[in-house]
Each structure stands twice: as C-alpha cells, then as structure tokens.
Amino acid sequence: MMVTSASKRILLIDDEPDVQRVVQTCLEKLAQWTVITATSAEEGLLKAIAEQPDVILLDIMMPKMDGYMFLDALWVKPEMQFIPVVFLTAQAGLLKPHHYETLGVKGIIAKPFDPLTLHRAIASALNWDLGT
C-alpha cells in the first residue's frame, strides 16, 4: 500500500542538482509530496526554519557546512528538534545504525537509491505504517 499525502513537505538538502531532480521527481510522483530544495546546508537551515518541513532529507558531504554541522545548527533551535531527519548519502556504508541514531537521525539512504526505498525511509520517519 502506498502512502500518499499532498500535505507532506520534504526538505531536500543536497549540493548535486541531478540528485535533487531525481529525488524530487520520485517523491512527487510516488507519494505526491511537495519537495523543497536547498543546494547547501546554510540555505537548508534557512528553509528549514522558514518552511517547517515534515521531514528533512540531508546529504552529509557538502562544502562549507556538512550534514553533521547542519544538525548541530538545526537542533539548537527548540522548535526544530522534532523534525525527522534522514541521511541521503554516498557514505551510507561507513555509518552503522547506532552511529546515526545517536545523532537523532531517523534513517539513512545510500546513493544511488531505489525510489521505493527512498519512499519507505521517509514514511518510516513519519511513523507511517506502509502495510508491507
């Protein structure tokens, strides 16, 4: 069963335009979610505060401010502490579940990714039952 909700907003923070296009297309077609994009962690932080997304998809390796620095900056703001974050990264094989869970991250998706895996990880972060 596919979970759909036009009201869900996903903030994608990734410095690669091709990744942004693929993720946006997948999520808008598969789940009819709205995808807000940011090409840097700094821009993502501003958009997270302004948009209050339902989930943040976050790349780890970015110039200037990486994904870990973004989390530090995001979670010092009390109103942002409850937004689920899912890593979308080429470094997935280097991270163990206990590592990202201690950071407060709800999941990790390896690049390249399968669209259904992407959808399931976000749905899981939203605590939705996919009925699989």
Regions found by a protein language model. Give the residues of each.
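Helix N-cap/capping motif at the beta->alpha junctions
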Residues: T37-L46, G67
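Receiver (REC) domain active-site loop signature in two-component systems and cognate sites
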Residues: M62
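Two-component/phosphorelay signaling modules centered on CheY-like receiver
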Residues: P17-I36
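Alpha4 helix (beta4-alpha4-beta5 surface) of REC/receiver domains from two-component response regulators
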Residues: M69, A92-I109, R120-A123
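Active-site beta3 strand of CheY-like receiver
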Residues: E51-L57
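Short amphipathic alpha-helix used as the core "switch/output" element in two-component signaling
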Residues: L46, Y68-Q81
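Non-catalytic signal-transmission and effector/linker regions of two-component phosphorelay proteins
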Residues: M1-R9, L116-T132
